[in-house]
Amino acid sequence: MNNTKKLSTNVIVFGALMTALVVILQLMGAFIKFGMFSVSLVLIPIVIGAAVCGSGIGAWLGLVFGAVVLLSGDAGAFLAVNVPGTIITVLLKGVACGFFAGAVYRLVEKYNRYAAVIAAAIVCPLVNTGIFLLGCRLFFMDTVAAWAAAEDFGDNAVRYMFFVLAGGNFLFELCLNIVISPIIFRLLNIRKKQG
């Protein structure tokens, strides 16, 4: 019983630390922009939290990420068009990227912890960007088409979505996560040795 209580306390404390880190990094990331949007530096603590504490904490950290995006004004261009669509897209992409990072980590960890870290680090930005693009398609396609036409993409709004709205951010986030993966792996090894 005492081990369960200790584990729960450790998970809560670690989750709280990762939550604070998500808030700080998302606010700092607002100063680094590719196109219209700031980069998501928070995907790293989301992956760490999901790997250490599981999909539930990963989903929580993603929810916090989404809430900070909405409250910081980073989603302002979309909020001006469709408030419910923006809230659904932003919160869902955050929760899902954290949840799936944790799920993939747990699935692959059985075979190789290093591969699990890399897989989670890849899945996190992939899910985040994928749901963002799906949200653009479902809720904002007319607006995206107008933006595409204004940027000389003609009637090719999908190409605009991939190359302007998501492209630079996705590549930055994916590369950063992959480069940081060995550090995440070392942190997890230290955590396993202590626990």
Regions found by a protein language model. Give the residues of each.
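Alpha-helical transmembrane segments and their cytosolic interface
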Residues: 1-19, 107, 138, 152-195
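Hydrophobic transmembrane alpha-helices
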Residues: 1-60
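Hydrophobic alpha-helical transmembrane segments
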Residues: 12-16, 44, 58-63, 87-92, ...
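Residue-level recognition of pore/gate-forming positions within transmembrane alpha-helices
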Residues: 19-23, 65-66, 94, 125, ...
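Interfacial aromatic-anchored transmembrane helix boundaries in multi-pass membrane proteins
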Residues: 25-39, 64-104
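Membrane-interfacial segments
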Residues: 29-33, 37, 76, 104, ...
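Mid-bilayer segments of alpha-helical transmembrane spans in multi-pass integral membrane proteins
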Residues: 91, 95, 99, 103, ...
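Internal alpha-helical transmembrane segments of multi-pass membrane proteins
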Residues: 107-130, 195
